[in-house]
């Protein structure tokens, strides 16, 4: 049996998109909202320990959404081709990983592809899974080039967690605690992620051919 020849794979370009202006620690609840109309007791503890000083939200103050996950991802992909816009037409695979798609169907990758009409009819995949979704997307693109199925791919990782962290998502639980005459504060474990996560997207351009100049 003839042994398969495996190709080299190179990351030839990277890009990212972060929505709106950075939000400082002091302003976070202006965007996410106040649970039970009260400032968080855990916020300063978490922020002191995680060292984060600002983050990005796909929200306006008051919680109005400004970008979908798919829109952010498409903008990161387009940023790969800022100086060479026609090159997006040569991409043969779009591999988009996320833990927080805008909806279950159509898939996240398909929705991103819908925001990239210039890319044409290409293969699209949508890996999911907390923390590892972006790496799954990267590995799929890597293997497709490695095995010679294609020569050029884009892999993305993106999250839009802010919508799930808004105060209105916690109000039902707070009201039940009040009815039970318990301390109406969400447990530390549940509120912890509100002060850890933010929104954004990144994209890698992968190729079986090295850049003639620059990094690979």
Model features per residue range: what roles?
Residues 1-67, 180-216:
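Condensing-enzyme catalytic core mediating Claisen C-C bond formation in acyl metabolism
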Residues 2-6, 78-89, 103-106, 110-216:
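Acyl-thioester C-C bond-transforming condensing/cleaving domain
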Residues 38-48, 68-84, 108-109:
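Short, well-ordered amphipathic alpha-helical segments that serve as non-catalytic structural scaffolds
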Residues 61, 88-91:
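Interfacial helix-loop-helix linkers and transmembrane-helix boundary segments
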Residues 92-99:
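Short glycine-rich or small-residue beta-strand-to-loop segments that form or flank ligand, phosphate
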């Amino acid at each position: 049996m003839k042994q398969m020849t495996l190709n080299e794979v190179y990351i030839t370009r990277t890009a990212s998109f972060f929505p709106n202006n950075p939000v400082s620690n002091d302003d976070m609840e202006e965007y996410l909202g106040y649970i039970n109309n009260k400032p968080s007791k855990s916020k300063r503890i978490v922020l002191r320990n995680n060292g984060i000083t600002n983050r990005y939200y796909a929200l306006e103050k008051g919680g109005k959404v400004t970008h979908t996950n798919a829109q952010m991802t498409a903008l990161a992909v387009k940023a790969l081709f800022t100086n060479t816009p026609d090159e997006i037409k040569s991409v043969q695979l779009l591999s988009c990983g996320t833990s927080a798609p805008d909806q279950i169907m159509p898939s996240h990758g398909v929705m991103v592809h819908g925001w990239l009409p210039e890319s044409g009819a290409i293969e699209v995949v949508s890996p999911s899974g907390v923390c590892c979704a972006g790496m799954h997307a990267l590995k799929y693109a890597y293997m497709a080039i490695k095995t010679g199925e294609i020569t050029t791919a884009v892999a993305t990782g993106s999250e839009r967690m802010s919508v799930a962290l808004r105060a209105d998502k916690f109000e039902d639980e707070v009201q039940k605690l009040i009815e039970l005459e318990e301390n109406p504060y969400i447990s530390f474990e549940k509120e912890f992620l509100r002060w850890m996560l933010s929104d954004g997207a990144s994209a890698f351009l992968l190729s079986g051919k090295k850049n003639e100049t620059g990094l690979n």
